[in-house]
Amino acid sequence: MSEPIIVVRDLANRFGSHAVHEHLDLDVMKGEILGVVGGSGTGKSVLLRSIIGLRQPSEGSVHVFGQNLPALPPLERSKLERRFGVLFQNGALFSSLTVSENICLPLIEHAGLSRADAQFMAKVKISLAGLPPDAGAKYPAELSGGMVKRAALARALALDPDILFLDEPTAGLDPIGAAAFDPV
């Protein structure tokens, strides 16, 4: 059996005296699809942020691909983080950039693609996320909630990540929009 790609041990996250997680252990294997389910405010997003390195846990360790993310030097950490695709709950798109520009940015910055190659790949990712081709020229404010989620998914897929993290990908969508998102 292969080694886990994510290993969380004895994780604790606290906000003041309020404990969100205590002694949490988690292994995620390559190819595994894992859903973390819980009510509002139960720490699902806090766990995600701890795993991807946006939050330093109060206690415990998080290893991704065998590496302790918080302990890595900045250059190595950045290299490891490029292996993640993250769809944040609110989409987290740059409002001053079009959908295509939001997708092109990591391709140019991190993959070193030319603008033309990045634009081509943005079209591929837009299609893959189930958006119409003309969505690329629109700004996030011009999109419906479901389209924002799909645009954010296209950006999360931009660098062909080894791990894809989805934080409440259908939150705020109507039942039809949520059902349409599932096949993507």
Residue ranges and their predicted role:
Residues 164-167:
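Catalytic Walker B motif of ABC-type/P-loop ATPase nucleotide-binding domains
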Residues 67-68, 115-134:
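Conserved ABC ATPase "signature" region
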Residues 37-39:
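The feature captures the beta-strand-to-loop junction immediately N-terminal to the Walker
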Residues 160:
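Conserved catalytic motifs of ABC-family nucleotide-binding domains
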Residues 139-143, 147:
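Conserved ABC ATPase signature
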Residues 52:
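Helix-to-loop junction immediately C-terminal to a conserved catalytic motif
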